């Protein structure tokens, strides 16, 4: 997705060789037009898969996930990082480690909103080691639903996330693949010297 690559180049900030900050359009301030286009692109890629639900994790996955849900005309469900006191019924849960924050959270989804007839597209902002997507896939399995695919806005291809997801039998679609953050510079897959 050219517009996304342009945004990453123009507004992304390389923190170190493993962390890319995209607060200006995705993780803090949200570029709504760009997220609309992201959602539409995921729709075009998965429109024939019978998607019934979009699943993400709070907070940064919500913007691209809700835009995808709008295009699919299905609900967007997000896993919560803490069980709210209002959640009285059963839950599906998984442990998820955040690469960026270096923390582990137990995320929960109410069993009221995810069931065995659901065909789920998991959406996330970043793919690093794949822990978030694998954890969300575990929640889908607990519900006896089907994960149709994983949609990633920015993939750090130099980390093992894609390989881990594909080893788990999951279809991965990344809209922007970063090959390297070396030398304080973003290099995209296909642009390596």
From Swiss-Prot:
GO biological process: purine ribonucleoside salvage; xanthine metabolic process; XMP salvage
GO molecular function: xanthine phosphoribosyltransferase activity
Pathway stated in the Swiss-Prot or TrEMBL entry: Purine metabolism; XMP biosynthesis via salvage pathway; XMP from xanthine: step 1/1
Localization annotation: Cytoplasm
GO annotations of cellular component type: cytoplasm
Pfam families from the UniProt entry: Pribosyltran
E.C. numbers: 2.4.2.22
Highest taxon, organism lineage: Bacteria
Major localization listed first in the record, in broad terms: cytoplasm
Enzyme class: transferase
Residues binding 5-phospho-alpha-D-ribose 1-diphosphate, per UniProt: 128-132
Reactions accelerated catalytically: XMP + diphosphate = xanthine + 5-phospho-alpha-D-ribose 1-diphosphate
Keywords: Cytoplasm, Glycosyltransferase, Purine salvage, Transferase
Positions annotated to bind xanthine: 20, 27, 156
NCBIfam families: PRK09219.1, XPRTase
Family label: Belongs to the purine/pyrimidine phosphoribosyltransferase family. Xpt subfamily.
Subunit field text: Homodimer.
Role according to the record: Converts the preformed base xanthine, a product of nucleic acid breakdown, to xanthosine 5'-monophosphate (XMP), so it can be reused for RNA or DNA synthesis.
Protein name in the entry: Xanthine phosphoribosyltransferase
Lineage, uppermost ranks: Bacteria, Bacillati, Bacillota, Bacilli, Bacillales
């Amino acid at each position: 997705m050219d517009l996304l690559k342009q945004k990453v180049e123009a507004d992304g900030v390389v923190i170190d060789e493993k962390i890319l900050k995209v607060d200006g359009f995705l993780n803090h301030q949200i570029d709504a037009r760009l997220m609309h286009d992201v959602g539409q692109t995921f729709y075009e890629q998965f429109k024939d898969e019978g998607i019934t639900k979009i699943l993400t994790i709070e907070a940064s996955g919500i913007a691209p996930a809700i835009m995808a849900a709008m295009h699919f005309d299905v609900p967007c469900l997000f896993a919560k990082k803490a069980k709210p006191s209002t959640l009285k019924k059963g839950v599906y849960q998984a442990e998820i480690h955040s690469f960026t924050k270096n923390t582990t959270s137990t995320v929960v989804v109410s069993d009221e909103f995810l069931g065995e007839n659901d065909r789920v597209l998991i959406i996330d902002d970043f793919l690093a080691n794949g822990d978030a997507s694998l954890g969300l896939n575990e929640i889908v399995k607990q519900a006896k639903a089907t994960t149709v695919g994983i949609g990633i806005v920015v993939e750090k291809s130099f980390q093992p996330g894609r390989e881990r997801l594909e080893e788990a039998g999951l279809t991965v679609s990344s809209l922007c693949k970063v090959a390297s953050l070396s030398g304080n510079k973003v290099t995209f897959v296909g642009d390596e010297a």
